[in-house]
Structures are given as structure tokens and as C-alpha cells.
């Protein structure tokens, strides 16, 4: 008998599953007999419990398991026979009004994958960012690298500001050592007192009022000031309250940046200390980073363009599944940050609804585009990307081995290659406008994405 598939909506379907009770009972009996061989009950040796007692104890559980298995098997058979592309998991409910003495009947309600209509790629518009790495970008990177290697000299030993002597006031960029005492309504509070506390003025590590109070002090001088803690301050006992502080400056140290010389080049991994080689390596790294960032921006542009020209309905079941994935990813992120009980954090799935819908929609569009145009990742493409990624590490061969030793990592690289194939394919047909941007603007754009 042909199965009747009812249309309940654009993607929602329903089909009735019928199971002969005698077939189900036969399977129940077989499982109970198998179970009886190992059942333990007080007063009986293992495997010697009467079958009737085993049935009384486990019949309900076994029946539920058999029905679940049989329903799933029958649904799979119907899906194949009717060429149904089921999206997500079906839900099953007994048809109470049609139960017969000889048959179990269940309604299976589910969604199917949609038809994906991708419009004319020639109408898609994409702005492609490009950037050029020159001496200015290399010099800015060297400045950053120097600041990362800053060291400090005690007052009187010289430094970036010049030798102002031991009685010169502290200024932004100086590293200061202080003692401080804080009170609220005349009473000291936890965390409000410290000795030999070290911080760098201008880094923003301390609250603004604290930094302002330390600025301009000389070694041995003190200053009193009021500090109002923000309402959202991490210390709940003092949040929103005003404290009276006394800060005493004990030591001031000048910042000193290393010279760009052979030793500096060696610290960056240039073994012979050659400055020309150092600049060439920095340029190569910046170009690699610029390529990665421009690819990311262009990929997002292409994905947005594909969504604009595509028509499809999105299965709710797939959106809900992806919402749960995003919730788990958020919990894992919290756990990595050291948040206690992160795995049980009450994160509402609804907050990811729009993101999940976009992800699912894009996945369906990309799958259709890849299938229709043969854009699957080739082994040599995957290897080329792995090799390129490995170049930025000290031991590229070890990184390559690391990738190929784990199928999940390799699958992630394969997915990246597929996306790259899609991007290249779309760029070859879309209206593309090239836009030159600075490396700083490029970095800012990808940081905000």
C-alpha cells in the first residue's frame, strides 16, 4: 500500500506509520527471552529467573524500546520509498482515534529540505578590499614590536624622556611603584590597601581617578583623592560607592625602547641579525596577514550577496539544532575563560535565533552552489592551504603532520577550501569593485566583523 504524505505547510509534512501488533509482540518476546539470560533477582541464580517474572518486571520498558526502534526503521523505509529529504528529527505521536486491535498507528511529523533558488550571479555586487604593504606599515610594526619589548630604568639612568633626575614628576608611560590606602566612610575595605603596587601610567589598567592622582607626583610624595567606583564594578561591595584614597609614590621608572639593531633582529628570529632580512620577513608576515584579512572581508561580502539573490524557506528544525550548537559553543567559551559552572550556564537559545537562521540559510545555499558547479575541495587544494598555514610556524612540517593526524582538523580545512572555491566562483561572475584600504583600516574592519 502506498504511503500518503500530507503537506502541512511549505516544508512541514506528516505521514502515518502502521505496525502490526503481532510483529511488535514477537520482537518483545524475543528481547525478553534474551534479557532473561542475564537478569538478577533475589532468590534466583543468574539466568534462572522465570520468564513470566522477567516479563512482569521489564515488559513496559522493552515494549517502549521495540516500538521506538520499529517506528524509526519504518520511517526510514518510507522516507526512502517516497524520496523524502528529511530535515532534522521527526516527532512521533500515536493516532489514538485509529488504533485497531491488530495494528499500532503513529503520526510522524517532520520537515523536508527546501528547494533552493539561486539568482543570477551576474547581478551580485561585491566590494573587494585590497591593501599594499610598504615601508610605513613595516615601521609601524617595528614600533609595536619595540613597545612589546620595553624595559624600564630607574630615575636618573636615562630613558625615552631623557634624564630628568630623581626628582622629576611621574608622567604617562612611566612605571610607578606606589602604596595606597582606601576607605569608605572612614572604614578600610577589602582590596582597598596595597604596598609596592606597580603599574604603568597611561595603560588604562587603573581607574582614571587613580591614574590622575599618581600623575605629577615625585618619589616620596603623597596625594589624597576621592574615587567613585562604577556601578558595574566587579567588586560588588564597593560598586557605585565613593572611596577616599591616599596614594604615596615610592619609585618612578622611565620606559626605554630597544634600539633597532642586530640584537633586536635576532630577538625576532633573524639568526644573523641582518636588518634587511628582518624587514623582509616582517613584510612577508604582514602580507600574509593582509591576505587573510581581505579574504575574510571578501568572503563575508560574497555570502551577503548570495543571500540577497537566493530564495528558500528554512526548516525550523535545522535552526533550532544550530541554536543549540551555538549555546554549547558559548558555554565552551565561558569554560575556557575560567567561568565556574559554565557547562550549566543558563544561556537562552533565542538569543542566537537570527545568527542560526543565517548560518543554516547560508549552508543550504552553499551546498546547492557546490553541488551544481562541482566546487568540492580537491586533496591538492587542502594540502596547499595546510602548507600555507604552516609557513607562519617555526616547524612547518610538524604543523602539517598535526593537521593530517586528525580528521576533524582536516575536515575544518576542507570546509575552508570549499568556501574559498565558492568565493572565487562568485567573484568570477559578480560585479566586483576593488577598493584600496590601509592595513590599519583592514585590521579594524576584521576586528569589528
UniProtKB/Swiss-Prot annotation:
Q: Which Gene3D superfamilies match?
A: 3.10.50.40, Trigger factor ribosome-binding domain (3.30.70.1050), Trigger factor, C-terminal domain (1.10.3120.10)
Instruction: Give the main EC class.
Output: isomerase
Isomerase as a keyword? yes
The record's InterPro entries line, in alphabetical order, gives:
PPIase_dom_sf, PPIase_FKBP_dom, Trig_fac, Trigger_fac_C, Trigger_fac_C_sf, Trigger_fac_ribosome-bd_bac, Trigger_fac_ribosome-bd_sf, Trigger_fact/SurA_dom_sf
Q: EC annotation?
A: 5.2.1.8
Entry text on domains: Consists of 3 domains; the N-terminus binds the ribosome, the middle domain has PPIase activity, while the C-terminus has intrinsic chaperone activity on its own.
Which family is this sequence assigned to?
Belongs to the FKBP-type PPIase family. Tig subfamily.
Q: What is this protein called?
A: Trigger factor
Native organism taxonomy: Bacteria, Pseudomonadati, Pseudomonadota, Betaproteobacteria, Burkholderiales
The gene behind this protein is tig
Amino acid at each position: 500500500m502506498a504511503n500518503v504524505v500530507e503537506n502541512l505547510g511549505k516544508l512541514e509534512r506528516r505521514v502515518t506509520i502502521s505496525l502490526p501488533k503481532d510483529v511488535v509482540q514477537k520482537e518483545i518476546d524475543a528481547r525478553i527471552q534474551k534479557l532473561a539470560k542475564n537478569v538478577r533477582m533475589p532468590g534466583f541464580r543468574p539466568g534462572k529467573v522465570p520468564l513470566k517474572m522477567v516479563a512482569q518486571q521489564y515488559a513496559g520498558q522493552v515494549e517502549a524500546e521495540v516500538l521506538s526502534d520499529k517506528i524509526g526503521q519504518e520511517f526510514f523505509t518510507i522516507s526512502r520509498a517516497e524520496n523524502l529529504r528529511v530535515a532534522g528529527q521527526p516527532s512521533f505521536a500515536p493516532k489514538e482515534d485509529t488504533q485497531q486491535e491488530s495494528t499500532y498507528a503513529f503520526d510522524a511529523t517532520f520537515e523536508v529540505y527546501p528547494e533552493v533558488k539561486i539568482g543570477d550571479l551576474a547581478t551580485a555586487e561585491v566590494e573587494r578590499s585590497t591593501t599594499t604593504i610598504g615601508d610605513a606599515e613595516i615601521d609601524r610594526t617595528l614600533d609595536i614590536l619595540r613597545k612589546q619589548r620595553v624595559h624600564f630604568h630607574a630615575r636618573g639612568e636615562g630613558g625615552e624622556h631623557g634624564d630628568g633626575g630623581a626628582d622629576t614628576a611621574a608622567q604617562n608611560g612611566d612605571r610607578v611603584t606606589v602604596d595606597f590606602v582606601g576607605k569608605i566612610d572612614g572604614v578600610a575595605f577589602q582590596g582597598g590597601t596595597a604596598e609596592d603596587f606597580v603599574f604603568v601610567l597611561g595603560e588604562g589598567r587603573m581607574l582614571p581617578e587613580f591614574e590622575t592622582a599618581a600623575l605629577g607626583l615625585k618619589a616620596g610624595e603623597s596625594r589624597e583623592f576621592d574615587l567613585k567606583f562604577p556601578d558595574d564594578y566587579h567588586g560588588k561591595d564597593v560598586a557605585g560607592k565613593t572611596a577616599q584614597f591616599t596614594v604615596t609614590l615610592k619609585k618612578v621608572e622611565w620606559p626605554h625602547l630597544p634600539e633597532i639593531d642586530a640584537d633586536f633582529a635576532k630577538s625576532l628570529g633573524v639568526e644573523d641579525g641582518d636588518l634587511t632580512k628582518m624587514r623582509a620577513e616582517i613584510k612577508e608576515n604582514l602580507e600574509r596577514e593582509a591576505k587573510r584579512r581581505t579574504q575574510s572581508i571578501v568572503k563575508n561580502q560574497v555570502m551577503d550577496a548570495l543571500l540577497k539573490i537566493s530564495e528558500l524557506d528554512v526548516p525550523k528544525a535545522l535552526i533550532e539544532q544550530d541554536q543549540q550548537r551555538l549555546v554549547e559553543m558559548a558555554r565552551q567559551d565561558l569554560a575556557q575563560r575560567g567561568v565556574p559552572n559554565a557547562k550549566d550556564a543558563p544561556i537562552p537559545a533565542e538569543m542566537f535565533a537570527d545568527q542560526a537562521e543565517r548560518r543554516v540559510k547560508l549552508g543550504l545555499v552553499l551546498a546547492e552552489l557546490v553541488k551544481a558547479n562541482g566546487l568540492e575541495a580537491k586533496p591538492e587544494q587542502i594540502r596547499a592551504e595546510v602548507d600555507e598555514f604552516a609557513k607562519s610556524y617555526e616547524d612547518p612540517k610538524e604543523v602539517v603532520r598535526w593537521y593530517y593526524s586528525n580528521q576533524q582538523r582536516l575536515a575544518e580545512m576542507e570546509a575552508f577550501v570549499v568556501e574559498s572555491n565558492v568565493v572565487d566562483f562568485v567573484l568570477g561572475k559578480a560585479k566586483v569593485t576593488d577598493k584600496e584600504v590601509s592595513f590599519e583600516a583592514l585590521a579594524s574592519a576584521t576586528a569589528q566583523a
